[in-house]
Every structure is written in structure tokens, then in C-alpha cells.
Swiss-Prot record:
It is an enzyme of class 4 (lyase). The gene is cpeS. GO terms for molecular function: lyase activity. Belongs to the CpcS/CpeS biliprotein lyase family. Homodimer. This is Phycoerythrobilin lyase CpeS. It comes from the Bacteria. Acts as a chromphore lyase, covalently attaching 3Z-phycoerythrobilin (3Z-PEB) to its target protein CpeB (phycoerythrin). Binds the isomeric chromophores 3E-phycoerythrobilin (3E-PEB), 3Z-PEB as well as their precursor 15,16-dihydrobiliverdin (DHBV) but not other chromophores tested. While it can transfer 3E-PEB a non-physiological adduct is made. Chromophore is bound to the lyase in a ratio of nearly 1:1. Gene3D superfamilies: 2.40.128.20. The keyword Repeat does not apply. Its EC number is 4.-.-.-. Keywords: Lyase.
Amino acid sequence: MTKNLITINQFIQKSLGEWKSIRSTHSLAFQEVENSTSKIEIKELESNNKNVLGLLEKYNYTSKPSFIALSISWKAISDWEIDQKIEQDKTILLFLPKDKNKGIVLRNKGYTESVISSSEYLIDENENLNIKTIYSSTASEERICFLSNHIRSRYSVIRNNENNTVIQTSHTSEIRNMSILKD
């Protein structure tokens, strides 16, 4: 019996909303640990959004492919920073399915390097979203899974492309902000 896997559209619909996040990052190269907390908001964007159309243009898409567009914004505070100032940013992701469980992700900025980046995604047999991005000197592998409808877990590994050594790992626990769901 074949299991019907969750589709990328279903995974994204489950991810929409506001999340509270706690992340621990281990920099193996510098033997340092960073802990951070953040508020993350994931919104679906319309296909005719000017930023979405601009991103498609940057990737030289002349026709409009089938895609799901997201805006992810965050505000974070880290124990890495001495002054404990709040960092904030946002990114746009376009998921272009090749089939119901795998495809390409286009971003206006990368996860490990602040340049536009293209990734491959796959939803595995455990319904985890796996995203792999190859940059000029590093590769990022990220896995996002739902532990329940309101709890997500993210794991990431950054490797050196030259010798495949692990440079950094991180684990993030995300809890949906339930207060915004109440009337």
C-alpha cells in the first residue's frame, strides 16, 4: 500500500501564520554557540505581487510558471550580540513544483549567503520538507517537520563545498502563536 504524501501546497498551508521560535546554532569552525529567539510570520503572496514578478524576472522566467509564493519575515534577538539589539529581515520564496512532492525554491536572498539563490526541495516519506541549496563555497541542507499542527522543528547543516566538512548546525523549535487564532 502506497502512502499518500503531503503535497508542497498542503505543507505550506500548514506553515502559514505567526510562529515563536527558539534556535540554537553551533558554529563548529569557531567552536561557538548562539542561542536566539524570534517571531516569524509566514504569509502567502499573490502571483501578481510586484516583488514576486521581480524575482521571476531576476531568474529569467519569461513566462509565468506554476508556483506558490511566500513572504517570511522575522524579528530576532540573539545572545551573540553584546548589545542584544533586535534584528529583523524578510525574504520571498517561490516554490515551483516539478511534481507534488519535489521541485525548486527561488529566493531573493539565501539562507547562508545574502545573494539570490535557487534550491531543490523534496517532501520525504515522513512528510518532512527538505531543502538543499548550493552556494559558491558552501551548501545548506534544511529539514522542516511538523511535530503537531502547531509545533514545527527545523534542522540545518552548512557544509564546506571543497571538503564536505560541517561548518555549522542548528536546531529550531517553532510554536504557532495561538493567541492570534482566537476571536
